[in-house]
Curated annotation (Swiss-Prot):
Belongs to the FMO family. This is Indole-3-pyruvate monooxygenase YUCCA2. Disruption phenotype: No visible phenotype, due to the redundancy with the other members of the YUCCA family. Pathway: Plant hormone metabolism; auxin biosynthesis. Its cofactor is FAD.
Amino acid sequence: MEFVTETLGKRIHDPYVEETRCLMIPGPIIVGSGPSGLATAACLKSRDIPSLILERSTCIASLWQHKTYDRLRLHLPKDFCELPLMPFPSSYPTYPTKQQFVQYLESYAEHFDLKPVFNQTVEEAKFDRRCGLWRVRTTGGKKDETMEYVSRWLVVATGENAEEVMPEIDGIPDFGGPILHTSSYKSGEIFSEKKILVVGCGNSGMEVCLDLCNFNALPSLVVRDSVHVLPQEMLGISTFGISTSLLKWFPVHVVDRFLLRMSRLVLGDTDRLGLVRPKLGPLERKIKCGKTPVLDVGTLAKIRSGHIKVYPELKRVMHYSAEFVDGRVDNFDAIILATGYKSNVPMWLKGVNMFSEKDGFPHKPFPNGWKGESGLYAVGFTKLGLLGAAIDAKKIAEDIEVQRHFLPLARPQHC
């Protein structure tokens, strides 16, 4: 490490470094303190490997704490959502609430003594081939200062949901009512007796419509593409659990056939409700296209009863109305965009080919997308939710432990 220290020391005369505080980190740098980042740090900690977690927000799991609606629960049973090395409390229900999940994450961080550095926005991260180290430049802190953190390893844990997707819709600037993304939606209370257009029919869009109904609003759902809707449970067992068990014994297309037949028995023909099923089965579509099936928590019953209207693709928006591709026009008081999130990795990770510039996901799909070159790792990009993040977090910690036997960890130092 003497060569590394010497190389870094020479950079003190560079104009860029003169304005930047620089700190050498002995263990990995983890960008993001959501469940993926916390899981990776905990797995490293269990192997006596320190890490530094950088977080742009003011708290852990900021998406869960600040950008989710009040009625949210985990859509999968808690057994499939726990992070490594620490189960959920036995007192928690099968499907924990948002508040319970946040409390679990806070307890997890406390248990493993994980202390992220908050208010640190990563502006750029790149590999310095001269010294074989990662340089991560951030801005933030109390004085909004620029910092550079240096390490042999970089773990990208910003995940699939770093930035809101804001669709381009003709006429949106002309709409007279409020327009908000689901990241700003908390409950339907303020929309009581109002006609609301919800754009997007994923799990969030479907559940927001249900929440609006519960507050006596009048929601309409825009369904642009085909979608698989499955019951949350079949025969008293979670649909996800059944799928996982069956996949151990049967190929995907056989399990898909079973899921579709059971869904028709439980939910009926969703095509008649305007929710046309894709040609690919739900699991095959998830694997090939990354499209997650919707787990129904009561929305279909509201659609059948007429409390939720279903419209096809949105053509354009006018002052207080919207026109759809089938020619229908209806009036609305507000628009809620349930259009999801996207990765922001290409915005700040430079000079690597591990991630796609198009969607910000690793080029290699699960289970091979967790490891790149030169000490670069990714966690939380499996499209398998918390379960996938836990799997990759364990692999990353194991891999770094092997490497540290060949080159001991450095001591923290200014560079």
